[in-house]
Amino acid sequence: MGRVRNRATAQRRRRKRPGDPPAACAAIAVTGASRAQCPRVQVGVGSHAAAKRWLGRWRRKRRWRRVRKAGPRDLLPSAPTPDPPGPAPSPKDLDLGAQRERWETFRKLRGLSCEGAAKVLLDTFEYPGLVHHTGGCHCGAVRFAVWAPADLRVVDCSCRLCRKKQHRHFLVPASRFTLLQGAESIVTYRSNTHPALHSFCSRCGVQSFHAAVSDPRVYGVAPHCLDEGTVRSVVIEEVGGGDPGEEAAEEHKAIHKTSSQSAPACPREQEQ
């Protein structure tokens, strides 16, 4: 009985010291002791104050781990998402007032949509002194529009290609040229001696315009393909083309190559 009492007394007097490791902090069960005499403890933690300190350190470590994992960008408050743009107002909703009838008449006469009519009016304001020309090929598959003066300065190139196809043209910046329709109907041909992309309609074969290879920002438009009513005068200026001898040699080589590929060989040539 003396040993049992001594062991109970030793267990009752035993307390956790701050330097004890967590593994050594076991539950302290005191037989016959009241709650006022025995402090509140937890298994594996020790006293209540030590448990609070340990829990605070654990929470701080967990928070810093999340901070390092998230990065600085994720910690910043996200900007509020902008409101989606509302639907664009239809032409009927525009407050045109007494000009609505003129607007509809202008749009129907030119066969333009509301956006196209607005573009024409804005271009007229941005290009003062220029005229809005429209044109196309013979069958109507290719249609284009161009802003140019009413008095056209037409270039007559003397190269063999331009002489054969009679391509007189006036030059305009690419920003003033708009292909309205027929992109799928255009066939492009490029000569070895002429730095230009000659575009033809695949149905009727008419060339309405061409683009320069050296400067794609410039278009050459055929004046005879423009619609009537917008051209006031035409001044033709002849310019020199490439070297006639070089062009003739290249043309002869192209003709010989094409004829040799398409024409069958003579029986005598096959025997030799």
Curated annotation (Swiss-Prot):
Residues 1-17 have a biased composition (Basic residues). Residues 133-246 form the CENP-V/GFA domain. Its cofactor is Zn(2+). Residues 1-23, 65-95, 240-272 are annotated as: Disordered. Zn(2+) 2 binds at C157, C159, C162. Pfam families: GFA (PF04828). Zn(2+) 1 binds at C137, C139, C201, C204. It comes from the Eukaryota. Keywords: Metal-binding, Zinc. GO terms for molecular function: carbon-sulfur lyase activity; metal ion binding. Residues 79-90 have a biased composition (Pro residues). The keyword Zinc applies. Binds 2 Zn(2+) ions per subunit. Belongs to the Gfa family. PANTHER family: CENTROMERE PROTEIN V, CENTROMERE PROTEIN V-LIKE PROTEIN 3. This is Centromere protein V-like protein 1. The lineage of its organism: Eukaryota, Metazoa, Chordata, Craniata, Vertebrata. The gene is CENPVL1.
